[in-house]
Amino acid sequence: MIAQDIEKVLLSEEEIENRCVELAHQIEEDYKESGETPIVVGLLKGSVPFMAELIKRFEFPCEIDFMSVSSYDGTESIGDVRILKDMDLSCKNRSILVVEDIIDTGRTLVEVKKMFKNKGCLDVRCVTLLDKPSRRVCEIEADYVGF
């Protein structure tokens, strides 16, 4: 049943689950090939359900951490990216897989990737459930895109 304030469902639960399986397999192949043990970093709080769906399907070693960043005031992007909670693990000389729920303007991802590079990370990749390239104001793309 659809709530009264929702006009229509764009993606079914089954479509999302199937795409998560495909993404997890693709990510797994890439990391198995490289032999790396990445730190999977979820950007709080929106990425949590998507990240849970992904990592329960991973069949390769990884560590999990979270960051809280914001470039929004309510529903509007303000352009300024702030780190509200940094990750706990050391990421120097490590590979990072950033998990995003949606890439909109791209500002958050640009700043997060820059921060990881400045901390000495070897490799920074990103997986997002939803991508909105029509809203992009920065030159950036996710390495893995759900929809």
Where are the predicted features?
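PRPP-associated nucleotide enzymes
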Residues: 1-147
